[in-house]
């Protein structure tokens, strides 16, 4: 009788482990796109209703051309939040991913920490070859119907001890321009003196493994606060009343292709002119 009970318990635990592993593998391999709408007070009228396809932390994964074809014509720009590759990822795979993304829209990208450890020069060349634009502490003007939004790419320091530089200055005539910043590591907000209208970041993977009620298992205090999703804060000295930031869970995975309560994601973000009374 005791032996039968032990066998039943053992079998039950094995089944639970198999199901858990299958779920974690499924979450890590998703091609899901999270749809969001962000209200921006300073957004020019011409940009009202425009969309950004945002993806970060691809790492080793391959994008699906078949899946992303449905987003052609639905995004005005594609923004990559860094870690487009990592060590031992062939540049040919990176090129294939970038070619797929360039079919969705004009690509703008920043380096992530793993890009810098892998092959930054090769990655920069592949970006150029596929029509992408690498932003390294640079501003670029996005233009529609004579109106402009400033897109700023913040460069990733090689090590955290190197620190982040200040945001590149805008021309005097554009000091009140609507500004979108893409930066790999959201820790940048601790050093940025002036917050832009919108920040797009990655790096955290949302913790990748999250436990119910507890959250991310392997994030420090700052990243546990800013782990994934939409965030905003109020700065009395800022001209932007409600600066907003999206931290993506990322498309790829670190070390193992497993996730729990933290599925892989890409983003389609619709920009709307108006008061940022809530985040969607």
Task: List where the protein language model places each region.
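Conserved acidic residues
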Residues: 76-78, 105, 177-180, 197
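Membrane-embedded segments
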Residues: 50-141
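Binuclear metal-dependent hydrolase catalytic cores centered on His/Asp/Glu-rich metal-binding motifs
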Residues: 125-138, 144-183, 189-191, 256-260
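Conserved beta-sheet core of the metallophosphoesterase superfamily
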Residues: 186-268, 275-276
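Beta-strand-turn-beta hairpins that frame and shape the catalytic cleft
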Residues: 37-53, 132, 140-153, 176-178, ...
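Short, charged, surface-exposed secondary-structure boundary motifs
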Residues: 86-89, 144-146, 162-163, 208-216
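Catalytic metal-binding/acid-base residues of hydrolase active sites
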Residues: 59, 85, 114-115, 139-140, ...
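N-terminal membrane-anchoring alpha-helices
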Residues: 1-46
């Amino acid at each position: 009788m005791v032996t039968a009970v032990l066998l039943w318990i053992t079998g039950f635990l094995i089944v639970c482990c198999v199901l858990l592993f299958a779920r974690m593998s499924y979450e890590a391999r998703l091609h899901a796109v999270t749809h969001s709408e962000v209200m921006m007070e300073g957004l020019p009228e011409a940009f009202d209703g425009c969309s950004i396809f945002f993806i970060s932390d691809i790492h080793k994964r391959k994008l699906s051309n078949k899946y992303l074809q449905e987003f052609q014509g639905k995004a005005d720009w594609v923004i990559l939040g860094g870690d487009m590759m990592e060590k031992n990822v062939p540049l040919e795979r990176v090129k294939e991913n970038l070619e797929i993304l360039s079919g969705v829209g004009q690509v703008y990208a920043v380096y992530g920490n793993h890009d810098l450890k892998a092959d930054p020069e090769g990655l920069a060349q592949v970006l150029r070859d596929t029509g992408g634009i690498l932003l390294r502490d640079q501003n670029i003007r996005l233009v529609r119907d004579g109106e402009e939004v400033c897109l700023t790419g913040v460069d990733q320091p090689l090590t955290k001890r190197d620190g982040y530089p200040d945001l590149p200055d805008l021309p005097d005539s554009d000091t009140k321009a609507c500004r979108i910043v893409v930066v790999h590591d959201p820790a940048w907000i601790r050093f940025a003196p002036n917050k832009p209208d919108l920040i797009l970041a990655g790096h955290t993977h949302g913790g990748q493994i999250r436990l119910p009620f507890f959250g991310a298992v392997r994030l420090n205090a700052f990243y546990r606060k800013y782990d994934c999703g939409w965030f905003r804060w109020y700065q009395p000295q800022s001209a932007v009343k409600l600066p907003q930031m999206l931290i993506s869970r990322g498309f790829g995975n670190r070390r193992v292709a497993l996730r729990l309560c933290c599925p892989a994601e890409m983003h389609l973000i619709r920009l709307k002119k108006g008061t940022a009374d809530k985040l969607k």
